Swiss-Prot record:
GO BP terms in the entry: mitochondrial electron transport, ubiquinol to cytochrome c
Cofactor: heme b
Family, as annotated: Belongs to the cytochrome b family.
Matching Pfam families: Cytochrom_B_C, Cytochrome_B
Free-text remark on how the cofactor is bound: Binds 2 heme b groups non-covalently.
InterPro entries the record matches: Cyt_b/b6_C, Cyt_b/b6_C_sf, Cyt_b/b6_N, Cytb/b6-like_sf, Cytochrome_b, Cytochrome_b_C_euk/bac, Cytochrome_b_N_euk/bac, Di-haem_cyt_TM
Binding-site positions, heme b b562: H83, H182
Lineage: Eukaryota, Metazoa, Chordata, Craniata, Vertebrata
Organism: Ammospermophilus harrisii (Harris' antelope squirrel)
Protein name (record): Cytochrome b
GO molecular function term, any single one: ubiquinol-cytochrome-c reductase activity
Length: 379
């Protein structure tokens, strides 16, 4: 009798995706982040579901409903902080996952990579709308500032902003629709993840060498299930340390003040994971230019397959490209730091230099470095 795992229509799909999947034997811990992102998404959907049971999306009661969750609901404080800090863990895993893709040339799988970039946009949109829901000062002013950026779009900008707001300012209609979108988007993300995996399994996984590994594949289970469980335990450990010891470490104190349209906080800034893009936005004095730079700072990831000039796929044997990659990482850290600083000297000029360097490295320096390495290979 054949195994049900290999014959049952539903279980067969799971088997081909997570059990009998042929996997390169040499993939390192950098390949753990896909499964960790799946775990993060599951944690966010579950904690979010329980939060939604007690949350009210009304401007009069939103802030107090979050307070009620933390004070009166059984383990409400735990659920709330797991959700808030779970978002941070989600983005840490996302950035490492994307960084791995860039370093090892995984972007040469066009469909998988482009769906991944769309997923990144979807997660960023979800996180932004989620930050608005507690209706604190930073929630309100963050929503006002970021949605207002759309007014830079010629001709339709102002109408578009008022349409998104559902009025002439960020108010009850805005909060209600943001809650609705924040609830539905994770399920759309989950569907996109399925498509992401579908395209990945069409080609098989990349590996650190960047070479074809068809001759050396091993089953996903038990080898990589065990490896993933280690990653899962470390992620949960990190998340729980954050939640139980310093839950407000990554938050903004201003968000513990209820939203007040008449009082602007001294420094309006988004959550830490958006600061690099926010720094790029602020470094351009023109509103439309800033918005375009902001969008392009993420959209530029889609150009990586076109900008790949090297004869080798991975950076593992390319020391010059490695050097440029780590300069890019350092530049992103610099942008993140600048995004959280006030708009004054010397932060303005540092932000502008870091922004120019960011686009220069990706569009010019890395392709040029690859061409130089190709020449060196001939020697």
């Amino acid at each position: 009798m054949t195994n049900i795992r290999k014959t049952h229509p539903l279980i067969k799909i799971v088997n081909h995706s997570f059990i009998d999947l042929p996997t390169p034997s040499n993939i390192s811990a950098w390949w753990n982040f896909g499964s960790l992102l799946g775990l993060c998404l599951a944690i966010q959907i579950l904690t979010g579901l329980f939060l939604a049971m007690h949350y009210t999306s009304d401007t009069m009661t939103a802030f107090s409903s979050v307070t009620h969750i933390c004070r009166d609901v059984n383990y409400g404080w735990l659920i709330r902080y797991m959700h808030a800090n779970g978002a941070s863990m989600f983005f840490i895993c996302l950035f490492l996952h994307v960084g791995r893709g860039l370093y090892y040339g995984s972007y040469t799988y066009f469909e998988t990579w482009n769906i991944g970039v769309i997923l990144l946009f979807a997660v960023m949109a979800t996180a932004f709308m989620g930050y608005v829901l507690p209706w604190g000062q930073m929630s309100f002013w963050g929503a006002t500032v970021i949605t207002n950026l759309l007014s830079a779009i010629p001709y339709i900008g102002t109408t578009l902003v008022e349409w998104i707001w559902g009025g002439f300012s960020v108010d009850k209609a805005t909060l209600t629709r943001f809650f609705a979108f924040h609830f539905i988007l994770p399920f759309i993300i989950a569907a996109l993840v399925m498509v992401h995996l579908l395209f990945l399994h069409e080609t098989g996984s990349n590996n650190p060498s960047g070479l074809i590994s068809d001759s050396d594949k091993i089953p996903f289970h038990p080898y990589f299930t065990i490896k993933d469980i280690l990653g899962v335990l470390l992620l949960i450990l990190a998340l729980m340390i954050l939640v139980l010891f310093s839950p407000d470490l990554l938050g903004d104190p201003d968000n513990y003040t209820p939203a007040n349209p008449l009082n602007t906080p001294p420094h309006i800034k988004p959550e830490w994971y958006f600061l690099f893009a926010y720094a790029i936005l602020r470094s351009i004095p023109n509103k439309l230019g800033g918005v375009l730079a902001l969008v392009f700072s993420i959209l530029i990831l889609m150009l990586f397959p076109l900008l790949h000039m090297s004869k080798q796929r991975s950076m593992i044997f390319r020391p010059l490209s490695q050097c440029m990659f780590w300069i890019l990482v350092a530049d992103l850290f610099t942008l993140t730091w600048i995004g959280g600083q006030p708009v004054e000297y010397p932060f303005i000029i540092i932000g502008q230099l870091a922004s120019v360097l960011y686009f220069s490295i990706i569009l010019l320096i890395m392709p040029a470095t690859s061409l130089i390495e190709n020449k060196l290979l001939k020697w």
